[in-house]
A protein has these predicted regions:
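Membrane-embedded alpha-helical bundles of multi-pass transporters/translocases
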Residues: 1-377
Length: 377
């Protein structure tokens, strides 16, 4: 992507090219007939993840190029994250709407999700390709061919801190997502239907919280806002653990507070990485925007994958999801993993990011130096 040049720009062609790949993967998975082979499903996952990587990476890197301004980048990624959560909510609401509103089956609801994706993707990408500009690139590029090229990125202190923070802040919500229904069923004794409603409240709050984190970043700086986000995640986890969930109003309020920080880390880390990319370009003369965002995407996925190890640990403790007589040790382990481990990871990420030195005044100096060199970015 960093090597792409042409009349359509650097990122637009990749976003457009992701559409047929995502459509193909969606049709393979959402329209799969009963009895399809594991190989077919595996291939469908490969296709859809390929398309998703193309689309999300081009989108994130493109957003970083829309403005060189420190604060404006926070706003851009704030609306980007708002759109992400809104889109996720819209898709997740399709199955219950089909089942409850149209008397459809669960299978029809799942397929409706696929058709929604197939129908909306070309429209959304066409609007973005038509209406969103892409500034010209002045810095030269040198393709990364060796492992050392990637390791050199992590030698930059700002980039290394961002990658570590992304790993930690991807790991923590991955754990809570994986164990959410188990925790509310086994520890809080909340029925699955009510737990799903609480999850909806959580994501609505996450969507509404995204602009708030952008606003806070403009007021106190991105790295301080990110540290505050991590500490709020920690506090919300302790609140979820401490407050009984038997009263719907109380449970809803607690889950709304817990959802508010959900959108903060993705948008703030990406806005900060755009600033770190400017610093790297000043140092090397090379624009590695797409490479930086691909590495950040990778650290987030590693964090999500690490979250799945909690299933192995729960199994070792003898926890059974469908059982109603899990041992005390298994339930303590579940609570420790749902609350304790993400809380520790959030605290550690706050410590990591408080050492970050690329603030607004420093970024202004970097942009001025790039301008003097004739590299507007």
């Amino acid at each position: 992507m960093d090597r792409t040049r042409g009349r359509l720009g650097r990122f637009r062609p990749w976003l457009i090219a992701s559409v047929p790949v995502l459509i193909a993967g969606s049709l393979m998975l959402f329209m799969a007939r009963p009895g399809v082979s594991a190989a077919w499903l595996w291939l469908g996952l490969v296709v859809i993840y390929l398309g998703f990587s193309m689309g999300s990476l081009s989108q994130q890197a493109w957003a970083s190029a829309l403005s060189p301004d420190y604060d404006q980048r926070s706003r851009i990624y704030g609306w980007w994250q708002t759109g992400n959560v809104l889109g996720m909510l819209m898709v997740l609401l399709i199955p219950p709407l089909v089942e409850l509103g149209l008397n459809g089956s669960r299978v029809q609801g799942i397929r409706a999700m696929g058709w929604y994706i197939v129908a909306m993707l070309p429209v959304a990408v066409a609007i973005a390709a038509w209406r969103v500009g892409e500034p010209a690139q002045d810095a030269y590029d040198r393709p990364a061919r060796r492992l050392s090229d990637y390791l050199d990125l992590l030698a930059d202190p700002s980039i290394a801190r961002l990658m570590l923070a992304d790993l930690l802040m991807g790991w923590a919500p991955g754990i809570t997502a994986a164990l959410f229904l188990f925790y509310f069923d086994q520890i809080k004794k909340v029925p699955e239907a009510e737990a799903n409603i609480l999850l909806l409240v959580y994501f609505v709050a996450a969507m509404l919280g995204a602009p708030a984190w952008s606003w806070l970043a403009v007021r106190i700086g991105k790295h301080r806002a990110l540290a505050a986000n991590a500490l709020m995640i920690l506090a919300s986890l302790l609140l979820v653990m401490a407050v009984p969930m038997h009263q719907p109003a109380v449970a809803g309020a607690v889950m709304a507070l817990a959802g508010l920080p959900y959108s903060g880390a993705p948008l703030l880390l990406r806005a900060m990485l755009a600033d770190a990319g400017d610093q790297l370009r000043l140092k090397t003369g090379v624009d590695r925007t797409a490479l930086l965002y691909s590495v950040l995407t990778g650290t987030g996925k590693i964090g999500s994958a690490l979250a799945l190890t909690t299933f192995i640990m729960l199994d070792a403790l003898g926890f059974h999801a469908r059982a109603h007589d899990n041992s005390r040790a298994a339930l303590i382990g579940l609570q420790a993993m749902f609350v304790g481990l993400p809380a520790d990871l959030s605290l550690l990420s706050a410590v990591v990011i408080l050492g970050y030195r690329l603030d607004a005044p420093r970024h202004l100096e970097i942009r001025a130096a790039l301008a003097r060199r004739g590299d507007g970015g």
